[in-house]
Regions:
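Hydrophobic strand positions within the blades of repeat-based beta-sheet folds
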Residues: 53, 68-69, 104, 117, ...
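Beta-propeller blade termini
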Residues: 36-47, 100-109, 150-158, 206-214, ...
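Acidic/hydrophobic-patterned starts of short beta strands in beta-sheet-rich repeat architectures
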Residues: 47-56, 111-120, 160-169, 216-225, ...
């Protein structure tokens, strides 16, 4: 049984570019003292104070690898890249790889103070150390019950006991389920305990998982989204259940992307849901309407505000990235606009956080990144960069957006300038 979504406030606002953001009297944003409590920094694998760019990629089924690009005061430094291949990661040839660039999970699973890598749907672990993951690093495997698992588990403390847990989705025709593996983890990869939740979505779905604190209680909450058959669902953490997640999920407004952030600077977590109306498989024509952004602020839980953005059929809301892009202490929200999910077109509108009511209703910054001649043997140009992640890769206390497309990476604060950009390692020429 699911809880019906409550939409108490509904407003439709057309989003148009805005050159300046007027300061709001009494704004809760505090430059140098962010209202949020979660770290901005991208995962710092080698402990040098700068976060690394970490991603999985496979140009072909046999080419599965994890790429680690070290961070610096100028952003990722491609000349110091480490590439871990399938053999070094301990991923067997039988494990299915994916075609798209993907994020492995980075988390301290054993509590030794070093970040570890969890890669592939087979949940292989490369244990961290003072110099980060290396080809000769100790390895393990998290035992996942049943099969198959096509995407890497996500990490967060779902039961609030101070140890990071992993959550995975089992794509099984007979018994699809959310699987929660409790920390701390042994060096073999074995969890302290395991619990299963029967799938809350359609059995044919391949949902995405997002762990984050949606309600400010310090326990990680789970968003299950990007199912063409179901609305996004929220399972709150810290529950008195075997898994630590709530027994009944909360239905969120319809949409395909979810982000958590503190957009009004009040110290409470807010939820954003993007609804582009673009068919997930590009089989049907997009209806002649604007995309939507649904927002629920922590100060008014259960109350949703809806804004429309972009022009009709532009796909406003395809992907969302939350982060403080100007260092004022409030999270902002980058919204990707994509006309076709399988096409290489993408533009962005950044909504500024910290106004009297939270996110501004007009874009603060609009931008796109395009490569006219993509690198690699199969890409055809031009290709736009799509959202990969939002984090602080240069240690300046402000988040950057990482975009990837056509073998190119861009790191930007949403303006026309890049803090860093480079061709993907191994694809130049």
């Amino acid at each position: 049984v699911t809880v019906p979504v409550a939409v108490a406030v509904l407003a439709y606002l057309a989003l148009l570019p805005s050159e300046e953001v007027a300061p709001v009297p009494g704004s809760p944003c505090r430059a140098g003292g962010p209202a949020r409590t979660d770290p901005l920094l991208a995962p710092d694998l080698d402990g040098d104070g700068f976060g690394e760019l970490v991603y999985e990629e496979s140009a072909d089924p046999d080419g599965f690898q994890v790429v680690v690009v070290p961070g610096s005061a100028r952003g990722p430094v491609v000349g110091r890249t480490t590439v871990l291949n399938r053999e070094e990661l301990g991923v067997p040839d039988s494990v299915q790889s994916i075609d798209d660039t993907w994020r492995p999970t980075v988390a301290d699973l054993d509590g030794d103070g070093h970040l570890d890598l969890v890669v592939s749907g087979d949940a292989r672990v490369v244990w961290g150390g003072p110099d980060g993951p290396r080809a000769d690093s100790p390895r393990g495997r998290v035992p996942l019950p049943g099969a198959p698992y096509h995407t890497v588990p996500v990490a967060g403390d779902v039961d609030g006991d101070g140890h990071l847990d992993l959550v995975a989705y089992r794509f099984s025709a007979k018994n699809p389920a959310l699987v929660v593996l409790k920390g701390p983890f042994q060096r073999s990869g074995a969890p302290a305990d395991t619990a299963e939740i029967p799938t809350p979505v359609n059995e044919a779905a391949f949902p995405a998982l997002l762990l984050g604190d949606a309600n400010g209680d310090r326990a990680a909450d789970l968003a299950v989204y990007d199912s063409p058959y179901d609305p996004p669902l929220l399972l709150t953490g810290g529950a008195d259940t075997p898994s630590g997640l709530s027994a009944e999920p909360e239905r969120l407004p319809a949409g395909e992307s979810v982000a958590f952030g503190d957009f009004d600077g009040d110290g409470r977590r807010d939820i954003a849901v993007g609804q582009s109306f673009v068919d997930p498989y590009d089989d049907e024509e997009t209806p002649y309407r604007r995309g939507r952004l649904h927002l629920a602020y922590g100060k008014e839980p259960g109350t949703w505000v809806t804004m429309e953005g972009g022009a009709p059929q532009e796909g406003f809301g395809t992907w969302l990235g939350a982060g403080d892009f100007d260092g004022d202490g409030c999270d902002d929200l980058a919204v990707q606009l994509t006309r076709k999910k399988e096409a290489a077109d993408a533009r962005f509108a950044v909504l500024h956080g910290g106004s009297e009511h939270g996110l501004a209703s007009e874009p603060w910054r609009t931008f796109r990144r395009t490569v006219a001649e993509p690198s690699g043997p199969v890409d055809e140009g031009p290709v736009d960069g799509s959202l990969f992640a939002a984090a602080d890769w240069d240690g300046d206390g402000q988040a950057e957006l990482a975009l990837f497309g056509g073998g190119h990476w861009w790191f930007t604060d949403g303006t026309d300038r890049d803090k860093a950009s480079f061709v993907e390692p191994g694809r130049a020429g």
